[in-house]
Amino acid sequence: MTNKNTSKDMHKNAPKGHNPGQPEPLSGSKKVKNRNHTRQKHNTSHDM
């Protein structure tokens, strides 16, 4: 009974803002940062 409650609580807390909140934004931030960096560098070169 306690295990079921913990599992439900962990599952709700994990995918709510722990699992999809940390690995997803981390992976997306890395890809977006890399893309943004390349775009910014290109933009700076073009502006110059």
From Swiss-Prot:
Cell compartments where the protein resides: Spore core
Region (Disordered): 1-48
Claim: Cytoplasm is one of the keywords in the record: no
InterPro entries the UniProt entry points to: SASP_SspP
Major location category of this protein: other
Induction text: Expressed only in the forespore compartment of sporulating cells.
Pfam families: SspP
Keywords attached to this entry: Sporulation
Ranges annotated as biased composition (Basic and acidic residues): 1-12
Compositional bias segments (type: Basic residues): 30-48
GO terms under biological process: asexual sporulation; sporulation resulting in formation of a cellular spore
Keyword Protein transport: no
Protein family membership: Belongs to the SspP family.
Protein name, entry field: Small, acid-soluble spore protein P
Lineage: Bacteria, Bacillati, Bacillota, Bacilli, Bacillales
Gene: sspP
